[in-house]
Swiss-Prot record:
Signal peptide: none annotated. It comes from Homo sapiens. It comes from the Eukaryota. The gene is FAM229B. Pfam families: UPF0731. PANTHER family: PROTEIN FAM229A, PROTEIN FAM229B. This is Protein FAM229B.
């Protein structure tokens, strides 16, 4: 029997905070992955192809504090 691509949903390892809820009967894997996955601790969103897992509702200050400051040139560090 030849293998048919897309006949079974792909499985990804469960990480901390990910939902452990299985698919409801009659719900396809693509319908479950589109939109939001709800978790008791955070909201997760998958892209339409189920390649990305994004944490939503993260404050902008989190991104601002995790960015590295721009490198200073030698002129700025040692003004004449």
């Amino acid at each position: 029997m030849p293998f048919q691509f897309g006949t079974q949903p792909r499985r990804f390892p469960v990480e901390g905070g990910d939902s452990s809820i299985e698919l409801e009967p009659g719900l396809s894997s693509s319908a479950a992955c589109n939109g939001k996955e709800m978790s008791p601790t955070r909201q997760l969103r998958r892209c339409p192809g189920s390649h990305c897992l994004t944490i939503t509702d993260v404050p902008v200050t989190v991104y601002a504090t995790t960015r590295k400051p721009p490198a200073q040139s030698s002129k700025e560090m040692h003004p004449k």
